[in-house]
């Protein structure tokens, strides 16, 4: 669901953080690594991650310069530092950062920070989604937070976690102990629409939050789980009665 860029010139540190931290537990499903600020800036501009973890002292472009370059972006930052420059960094950097961590990184401490961050991100995402959904009739079925059926809630949660992938109904119900026919029937009874319909509406809803972030429309289609742009465009028109381009013009 979320993305992180880990930037450190020491390979053992950046790869260690990538491999040791259970990122999936904190809803981070895409982890990028960079060996300096130049690589990190390119990744950040391309993928717009929710979190950047960066060292301060690196070749080519250091962490301070990187922070200056991304100050206008909406991303959270965790700074890594050695003992020698830790106090200087806290006093001298004027950017708002999520937290500072001394090397060697305390993985337990990092996970505490991630836990706090993901709660904030999920709440922001939920609020944004509810705000957008309330403005369009097509998204009304997505507004309900919880249903009185365990299996339906499990399927909805799975959709929200995996909508960005080329997921199928079988994929969505593989972790619950019921047949596909029972799951589909129960979902329709409680939600009023099919699982596939809910998935596609949710994908289009999420796409609205990306349309003003300077992505190409085919990039947005891929980011919200559509294998082809024409399928994204078809469902967009189906639910909103206009094309993505017309929606952007109307929103200006």
Curated annotation (Swiss-Prot):
This is Transcriptional regulatory protein HptR. It comes from the Bacteria. One of its GO terms (biological process) is phosphorelay signal transduction system. Disruption phenotype: Deletion leads to impaired growth when the available carbon source is limited to glucose-6-phosphate. Deletion also alters antibiotic susceptibility. Residues 153-250 form the HTH araC/xylS-type domain. GO terms for cellular component: cytoplasm. Residues 3-118 form the Response regulatory domain. Residues 170-191, 217-240 bind DNA. PROSITE patterns: HTH_ARAC_FAMILY_2 (PS01124), RESPONSE_REGULATORY (PS50110). SUPFAM superfamilies: CheY-like, Homeodomain-like. The modification 4-aspartylphosphate is found at residue 55. Phosphorylated by HptS. Member of the two-component regulatory system HptS/HptR that regulates genes involved in hexose phosphate transport system in response to changes in extracellular phosphate sources. Activates uhpT expression to facilitate glucose-6-phosphate/G6P utilization by directly binding to its promoter. Antagonizes CcpA-dependent transcription of a subset of CcpA-regulated genes involved in antibiotic susceptibility. The keyword Aminoacyl-tRNA synthetase does not apply. Keywords: Cytoplasm, DNA-binding, Phosphoprotein, Transcription, Transcription regulation, Two-component regulatory system. One of its GO terms (molecular function) is sequence-specific DNA binding. It is found in: Cytoplasm.
């Amino acid at each position: 669901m979320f993305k992180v860029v880990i930037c450190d010139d020491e390979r053992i540190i950046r790869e260690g953080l990538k491999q040791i931290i259970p990122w999936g537990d904190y809803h981070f499903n895409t982890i990028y690594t960079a060996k300096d600020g130049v690589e990190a800036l390119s990744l950040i501009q391309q993928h717009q991650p929710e979190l950047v973890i960066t060292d301060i002292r690196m070749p080519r472009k250091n962490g301070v310069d990187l922070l200056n370059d991304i100050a206008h972006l909406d991303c959270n930052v965790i700074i890594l530092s050695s003992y020698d420059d830790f106090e200087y960094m806290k006093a001298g950097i004027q950017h708002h950062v999520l937290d500072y961590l001394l090397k060697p990184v305390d993985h337990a401490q990092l996970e505490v920070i991630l836990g706090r961050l993901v709660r904030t991100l999920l709440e922001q995402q939920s609020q944004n989604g509810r705000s957008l959904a309330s403005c369009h009739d097509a998204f009304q079925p997505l507004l309900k937070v919880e249903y009185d059926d365990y299996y339906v809630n499990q399927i909805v949660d799975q959709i929200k976690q995996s909508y960005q992938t080329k997921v199928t109904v079988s994929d969505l119900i593989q972790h619950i102990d019921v047949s596909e026919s029972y799951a589909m029937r129960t979902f329709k009874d409680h939600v009023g629409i099919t699982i596939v319909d809910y998935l596609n509406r949710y994908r289009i809803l999420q796409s609205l939050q990306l349309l003003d972030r300077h992505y190409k429309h085919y990039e947005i289609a891929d980011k919200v789980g559509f294998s082809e742009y024409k399928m994204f465009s078809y469902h967009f028109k189906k639910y909103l009665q206009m094309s993505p381009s017309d929606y952007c013009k109307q929103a200006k």
